[in-house]
């Protein structure tokens, strides 16, 4: 704080939790609302609370990776909290988790539009997934797969659904200049990957995001 003042921490990430599927209906929207109300009562200064949406249990996603609350339930709880407490809690859409929930690359676009229409879109997190098992990550897994092969960059996965074009399409449906955060969440595979690779996948993906945003700004 002595160096950055009250802007030291831009946002705090939370999730709605807990796991639910057809047999385990544990996620509770009323408990989540109470938790948000309590969090909103604390003095966060200029730090914003952001709820990262994780894949919810749906008919398309009967065995979810996370299985937390639906986006609609999260948005309703956020809006109730903001209205009652005068807070500014928002939503972060995780690209991979929205793809997993919908089982297609239109999932993130739908979630972004839903959050934006309710004035709670606070950030985007790019984390990949894949539809097949021809890789070390696994089909529809929440293992933070790197983007698909792009240009001459070194660290990419050919089977990833998170292609350059899909990243551009995602950025294009929102005013990303108004977001509190735009991030990446990636995992190097195999588990014994070198430090060089772990750094490289993050570096190359940031280059990719920079290029996508530059092209969109030109347009």
Residue ranges and their predicted role:
Residues 1-88, 202-204:
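Active-site acidic/histidine proton-transfer and metal-coordination neighborhood
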Residues 14-18, 53-55, 95-97, 128, ...:
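Short, flexible loop/turn elements at secondary-structure junctions
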Residues 42-44, 95, 140:
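A residue-identity detector for tryptophan
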